[in-house]
């Protein structure tokens, strides 16, 4: 079991078009939101859908793949690790972010033509 200390596996649907940027040193980074939905019972015992949203981060060549092939609605399987960071807003408020830095990705609805 390699690297299970900080390991995340998700299957879900892309919730928005990926955002692709370039860092100051020229490295590409892509982010997107992935929705995972599971069935749960509410207080009355009725089965309902519960959706969680996850922010995914892709670096380098993976960011290129995301930019060219991933669109809203695409079904993906990913494996990665959790990353926590914080920043301070212009108004001085501290914000915390949890993201999944993706190591591996698979297209589950088949790969599409380049955008």
In which residue ranges do the predicted regions lie?
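Single-stranded nucleic acid-binding surfaces, predominantly the OB-fold ssDNA-binding core
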Residues: 1-115
């Amino acid at each position: 079991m390699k690297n299970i200390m900080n390991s995340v596996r998700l299957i879900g649907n892309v919730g928005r078009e990926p955002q692709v940027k370039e860092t100051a040193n020229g490295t590409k980074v892509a982010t997107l939101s992935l929705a995972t939905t599971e069935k749960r019972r509410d207080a009355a015992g009725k089965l309902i859908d519960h959706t969680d949203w996850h922010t995914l981060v892709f670096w380098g060549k993976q960011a290129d793949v995301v930019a060219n092939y991933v669109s809203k609605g695409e079904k993906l399987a990913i494996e990665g690790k959790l990353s926590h960071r914080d920043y301070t807003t212009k108004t001085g408020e501290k914000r915390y972010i949890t993201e999944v830095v993706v190591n591996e990705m698979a297209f589950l609805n088949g790969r599409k033509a380049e955008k």
